[in-house]
């Protein structure tokens, strides 16, 4: 089957950087150097990494949202990982930094989003970068500007772990910027779901169940939509969007859903034969 590419993207997966104060201080230092040198350019006011380009419609938001959560839930943190920024240079009309350390995250996002049937990534090879500024055509044609940009130095590392302020977001191309961030459709803190204790008593009560019928009995009447798919989706969003539910309940459901209307073990409060990941 041919792979569909987002060569005419309308959204992207964003990794914002404004919340990393040390990085931003050095990043703005580069921008000041450009302005001080008189380079005619438009400064980027929302530093970020574009991790994957998307060609999606509003009806795809839910699928991409869930894919992002699954990527976060499946991360093997260990001691975390580092993102390295260096080598200021010109890419097209932009002045950018090379970004290393997020290649695996990019691949995971693309694969998980494609598994949901959505179009992600472009036919050209993805290159991790962080835009500093965009040059005007006139500035790009001035040799002194090019030489100055090529002489600039930058080297900075950010460590990402479950307690860092890292986020993954769905952003529409052309979205407004405010206070260093893009307006987002979805934004998830990468560490917010790295928690193996039930976030609420109610989720603790239903954690071993594999079908919506028993879950409905534990919740208040009308808490869940009548449609099972919609019910599971709402549960995954319950209580401040904590995806703990995905790890401990939802994946069992994907396997045992065919048994829901037959002989569900939950009705007898037996342990599910399906092993957890």
Swiss-Prot record:
InterPro entries: Coronavirus_NS2A (IPR007878), NS2A-like (IPR039573)
The family this protein is said to belong to: Belongs to the coronaviruses ns2a protein family.
Protein name, per record: Non-structural protein 2a
Phylogenetic placement of the source organism: Viruses, Riboviria, Orthornavirae, Pisuviricota, Pisoniviricetes
